[in-house]
């Protein structure tokens, strides 16, 4: 539901700072008007946040609080001096040709232009470290995005994104300029996509999305053909896993793919300690139980734990956020280059 009234609040260290005390003209106030059916669902109440070194690594980082990405987009950079919050800048994109309607369900922070300061990549647009618009591709909102040195043969960083609007599909772009390096087209909403270094036989990252079942290298070359993947998928018999004990209902479907012609496309993960990414995959509804996939160059194989069991068999683990199968926390807690 749309929040009709709520005094905006920001949090300092251990103390709440009310709007009007030090925020003043900071984050935009709630209202019943947002544009693009702002009160439909929660489109006017989409929030993102990040921490960025807007003045470089020699200075303290800033918090970047964001509202809106389907239409209007506001980004508020704020510093904390130990006593109060101070606005660094407020970016407002309220018309086309800007970051308006360009955001994603997450943002990416990184120095995309090589000036030593972080920029905010906001879906199909990028905001400079001073709060100005760096560029906008105009390709619109998307559900997934990845920023990094995806192509080691090119200078700087690249950005991979999928798009919700027909026919944009997915694309890899120069993170500094917005130049499209390669793209795939789709006939519908491309709701999933992933960039991960899963194949040591190809330089850089591999990318794939739900618009078509192909795995591409960082140059855009197809390394797994769509038709082959579909043939394998259509002829594959589903592998069924025995129902869980304890909280699991024996009538619930807990199947997962022991072997899949296409890698999962929700989350990458460092899992087994080698130099490649593994994949955090998920089984069927209603719990979408998590398990680990390993790409062997031809197909994705379910990777058991050291005791021979799958991840979801340990502690009856489930995921959240429906088909996105989001973990509550994924992080390297022990510093061993493996993520828990």
Regions flagged by a language model, labelled:
Residues 1-340:
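Beta-propeller-forming repeat regions
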